[in-house]
Amino acid sequence: MEAHQFIKAPGITTAIEQAALAAANSALANAVVVRPFLSRVQTEILINLMQPRQLVFRPEVLWNHPIQRVIHNELEQYCRARAGRCLEVGAHPRSINDNPNVLHRCFLRPVGRDVQRWYSAPTRGPAANCRRSALRGLPPVDRTYCFDGFSRCAFAAETGVALYSLHDLWPADVAEAMARHGMTRLYAALHLPPEVLLPPGTYHTTSYLLIHDGNRAVVTYEGDTSAGYNHDVSILRAWIRTTKIVGDHPLVIERVRAIGCHFVLLLTAAPEPSPMPYVPYPRSTEVYVRSIFGPGGSPSLFPSACSTKSTFHAVPVHIWDXLMLFGATLXDQAFCCSRLMTYLRGISYKVTVGALVANEGWNASEDALTAVITAAYLTICHQRYLRTQAISKGMRRLEVEHAQKFITRLYSWLFEKSGRDYIPGRQLQFYAQCRRWLSAGFHLXPRXLVFDESVPCRCRTFLKKVAGKFCCFMRWLGQECTCFLEPAEGLVGDQGHDNEAYEGSEVDPAEPAHLDVSGTYAVHGHQLEALYRALNVPHDIAARASRLTATVELVASPDRLECRTVLGNKTFRTTVVDGAHLEANGPEEYVLSFDASRQSMGAGSHSLTYELTPAGLQVKISSNGLDCTATFPPGGAPSAAPGEVAAFCSALYRYNRFTQRHSLTGGLWLHPEGLLGIFPPFSPGHIWESANPFCGEGTLYTRTWSTSGFSSDFSPPEAAAPASAAAPGLPYPTPPVSDIWVLPPPSEESHVDAASVPSVPEPAGLTSPIVLTPPPPPPPVRKPATSPPPRTRRLLYTYPDGAKVYAGSLXESDCDWLVNASNPGHRPGGGLCHAFYQRFPEAFYSTEFIMREGLAAYTLTPRPIIHAVAPDYRVEQNPKRLEAAYRETCSRRGTAAYPLLGSGIYQVPVSLSFDAWERNHRPGDELYLTEPAAAWFEANKPAQPALTITEDTARTANLALEIDAATEVGRACAGCTISPGIVHYQFTAGVPGSGKSRSIQQGDVDVVVVPTRELRNSWRRRGFAAFTPHTAARVTIGRRVVIDEAPSLPPHLLLLHMQRASSVHLLGDPNQIPAIDFEHAGLVPAIRPELAPTSWWHVTHRCPADVCELIRGAYPKIQTTSRVLRSLFWNEPAIGQKLVFTQAAKAANPGAITVHEAQGATFTETTIIATADARGLIQSSRAHAIVALTRHTEKCVILDAPGLLREVGISDVIVNNFFLAGGEVGHHRPSVIPRGNPDQNLGTLQAFPPSCQISAYHQLAEELGHRPAPVAAVLPPCPELEQGLLYMPQELTVSDSVLVFELTDIVHCRMAAPSQRKAVLSTLVGRYGRRTKLYEAAHSDVRESLARFIPTIGPVRATTCELYELVEAMVEKGQDGSAVLELDLCNRDVSRITFFQKDCNKFTTGETIAHGKVGQGISAWSKTFCALFGPWFRAIEKEILALLPPNIFYGDAYEESVFAAAVSGAGSCMVFENDFSEFDSTQNNFSLGLECVVMEECGMPQWLIRLYHLVRSAWILQAPKESLKGFWKKHSGEPGTLLWNTVWNMAIIAHCYEFRDFRVAAFKGDDSVVLCSDYRQXRNAAALIAGCGLKLKVDYRPIGLYAGVVVAPGLGTLPDVVRFAGRLSEKNWGPGPERAEQLRLAVCDFLRGLTNVAQVCVDVVSRVYGVSPGLVHNLIGMLQTIADGKAHFTENIKPVLDLTNSIIQRVE
């Protein structure tokens, strides 16, 4: 069907009409939808106010303030679209959930009418939290809102929106509030009626009524059911008049939108506000006429809002203009007051002629009429007087001028002014008027009002300047200035007039002088309990922290704070500076914002301010929306117990590490001083000064903690040599030799006892060891180091993180810690544990253990040792315990030397212990293997892939380097060469946003090479030494190099850096844009290396879910942690970073970057702009589209005007059509019915051995009477075309033979040739060209009968669950959704129905050739309509299944065992079968109407029902070369074929038959079965059967057939072996082995159903078909032969019998 054939546009005759039609269509397409019900007057008012915008009225809601709310919604849409992610001032509670783009909302505590608004606010979503806080007076639960008001809130936001919420704030206050927020733009919607400029009174206008009592103005619009606006008059006047704010917070106020007297003001922070004069009311329709007597009292007995009448009256402009024109042009004899009154009465009547308004009229009060008559009469009198006097005096003047002589004229010419200063008439000075005189006029026209007022902000700068000037003036007079204007106390220049450096200065204004906060303060944990709750710290940690105290030494310097926190026996240092990076336990980054002048700091959702008070340092903390205030007294705090401190630090570290492992977002890493410091929870620049290398800093799990070597104050058993200097360029010096304690040989055991701290100072000739944290503690005394014994260890492998594997003795390690293979009790044992005890017996004193981590114990006596406990594999194999044994040794600073834990006495396999160490160690650790373990490692050590650089590759690469070196960009490559050889590398590949770059740590790399400047800047911001490929040629020699986006680097530069580096780690995505040959010299593809990823990362932290699904073809294993489900939007306004594909598009879009430049970058929002010149690029390189789609984290707008991305399968049409059809986001139960394989409880199938295929089919042919057919198919005569219009090709040549690959030459199905052109014509005409018998009747009776099976259906909603099932089905079929188009019925592809012939013929026990019936076809609807109707039909089907009685079975939506049990329970019943002939072809307008009735019951949108009726009632079937235009019928390829065929089948059976002892019924399409004891035809059946032309064939027998199974009451359902074997005989098992394998698997599935019922099936199936049981037995054996893959095939070439003669079309 092509719906466009029923849509016809009217003819357009001229270009003017065409332009007018285009303009009208455009106006309607962009019209404002008005949803409320409106009166006629309200409609006229709204049309006039909204001009020139087109309005579309779709009334569906009742509003209290319809006119204002429509205007409000329009202005709100404009403001939110321009503001983007912003802060909102005074949001309406009902708008909170609808606008997730708002960062923060400022509210005031509700009073009066606001309380009612909060009570009616939504109780779900973000609004619920706000509602709870507002009504219960609770503090905010997060940072997304506050109740401090706009003026007192300090949430940082660049853009703001205020919708009718600034009427109580002066412009100067708003300027200061914006400065406090750091806001540069604020979109404010305000209602500013011009009547507030007038004196108090009651003003009636055409739109609203305004009551002005001098202080407040109340505005009520036409039709309002409750009070309208009520605002302060003086503030409204200020907003009308002000165009700029000057002072410390300058603003420019611009009116960017206006609807009536509703304005959108754009307040922009500008350093020098320029003049911005504006006319606020250029379209005002009223003139305000002043009453000459002024206002009088109100005669009412009841109090009113305004007790006086108006001074001014609003008069329509057309009334006043018409009255002035009439009165000013009357003759002197005709002019009088009564004539004016008569004329005014006439023009005040509204006159309409048909639909044309000839006179608009005016409905005025008596006061207004009196004032207008008086003002008009006096104004005209004054004008007449001027006219008379001007003519009279002018004539006299002319007489004087004409009477002048030559001398007088010469004098006038010489001495009187002329030229530019001459204005005719000025020299006469007829009449001088004053502003307050009556002659100055009686009316005010708002159209002519112009405002440009500047207001100073309310800061004290102006007063300070005045004070300075006044004091200087007094001092100049020699007086002592002691006036009230002297500087306020506590300000710089507090010395008053004596400070000449400040007084009178305009350059250095007075600033608040903050007192020096340096000093020592005591911190008690119980003061910060509110903060611990805000941080969601576990209760045990909070309880421990509350019991502890700390002493903090604070040193303040300009823009810097140094803190030294002493907690028990531990000391921590932090440095607070602006821009410091805070450590985190998740992927988020936190940068500290510190302002010393404001004494504040903040990061993320945490902020604090501090102030020195007499009681101490007062700190106000805001964390996660909750506030905490603490005052830390000066002086020291009592020292905490070391055990308590150690337990607190240990628990805090475990909490941080647990959060880091399991949280997707994480938060601040909470150091001990972050919970017990004066600036919690911040601890920037955390450095530990303690002597205990405890608490796990720098472990494998903490990316941000110190990874330097550990320094301690314990005394070594041996003296050490002088410390070595730190390596240049490294953040921390490496541990010197003097700080390394080794296991002494047994001969030196006597020195172990001397491990006490000496008290003598260090000799002057020795260099003290390097200490990492200033100020350094006093170093211990070191003795001169003796020469170490020769080492015999052998290096086996080095990991990229610096960890090493050695073969040798643990005693040769230089690591800070030694790991002992201990037992759970940490008692001296055997093996390595015994060796440790011999050398370090003190290490086993449990009282000296400083920390326990799990089963591991840490000690510093006599040196750092960790006792680790591995599982005993002799008792139980416990891999988790083995992992934990290594993991528990990582809670330390410095490096550690390990043995293979458990591989000795505990008999843990070497491979398992090694793998556990490999997964749980820290950078720089060492593993020592015994010789047997080393042999295992040599055979299994990890190998890095190798890249072989051949001589040809090196020669070509060097040529490319020479070409590069000659350019300006590549001059750094001069002299660089690549030599042949082998390069080992590590290549981490991953999906976009998988964190490849973030996984690199600064300690792992020296140089980072990146392809673009954008990436270089990103790496440098993270603190890495990053270079572009050419510049990096100078710095990569011998360095550890990481190459980001390696596949996109020029290959010659990639090879150069890989060969020069000491170790190379490649990062990238092989599916993204490869290196581009900009020179087009052909060198790039010639030398591009084949890089093999060593690891693939499949989890993306950037890409939303919809992007992952789009790119899943390139990344089959991609997963995402993003919570954004839908991020791609089409044809919306551009946002964020613009991405283009070509340089031409980049030049046309300022600020855009190409996708090649964007590789590796991450943006919150992006806009992809596809231009026509990128068609070849996108079609040839899908990588460009992948890069563009994977750059954003939240939202991406696609502007695809040429449709390039749609051509590669990137479109949102499916989702748009789904929501257009009324779909909703929600969940239904899935439609998949869980099915399991039958258990072999009987296994009777095993009694049937495989049998001969040929004999089984011969026996089947004998039993059914079928013989070998001489032909492959029969083309029956084509029936007469009874209705519709057939389009057929001129050429109808057909092939006369068919090649088939089959099991037997005897076919047991009807013979047809689906691929023949004449067969297609016969099916088209015979099935869909037959006359449809229409039946006009009500559907109520049939629907009532259908209720026996399907009760009345309630409202149904199509949800995203059904949409997902639709998409899942499309994906399973290999479809990408590109065939789903926008719902445009003028497009033929949207509504096309494609027809093709079925290739499966029907099994029959009768004659296979002489049936003379046409074939069967499939009419596939377009994918657009399938996606449009499919979710609705699936949702309706689910609802029907939920309502069906348990004994009614629908389609395949049931478990087979349940149906079998129901049949088994009906042992005394007979089987009622009904067979329809031409079921689809006989469906007509009545069946279609019944479908529409059911759809209406389900709440389907009416337009969707009408569209379905249109598509079903008139259609065009499009075959490959033929097409048929027809009406009605049913098409088997519709999205609701099974649903509506089954419903129609149920309706016919329920309406036409009545059953006795009804037990079970099953319906599937046109197939049905009912188990009952008797049946009869209903009394209303004949009318329906005859009216619809139904062809029913009823069979009533003990055993029946239904949907491929045999229904045997009392036994159950059994597979139909005869039918299945007969259909196999017709199948073509060729031409390739794939088809044969598919059919073999189908046979296996069928046999699985025979597992337990094979013997019963032999007896029952043979009775149904009247064949011998032996046949069924042989057929089962034959199927087992086929399932075993031993089938025998015959290849036959058979002719096709053509019985067609001509196509006969009936002439109407």
UniProtKB/Swiss-Prot annotation:
Domain Macro: from-to ranges: 790-936
Annotated organism of origin: Hepatitis E virus genotype 3 (isolate Human/United States/US2)
Domain (Alphavirus-like MT) ranges: 56-240
InterPro entries: (+)RNA_virus_helicase_core_dom (IPR027351), Alphavirus-like_MT_dom (IPR002588), DNA/RNA_pol_sf (IPR043502), Hepatitis-E_Cys-pept (IPR008748), Hepatitis-E_hinge (IPR022202), Hepeviridae_RdRp (IPR047307), Macro_dom (IPR002589), Macro_dom-like (IPR043472)
PTM (free text): ORF1 polyprotein does not seem to be processed into distinct enzymatic domains by a viral protease belonging to ORF1, but could be processed by a host serine protease like thrombin.
A Pfam family per the record: Vmethyltransf
The name this protein goes by in its record: Non-structural polyprotein pORF1
Chain residue ranges for the region called Hinge: 714-793
Lineage: Viruses, Riboviria, Orthornavirae, Kitrinoviricota, Alsuviricetes
Annotated stretches, region: X-domain: 800-957
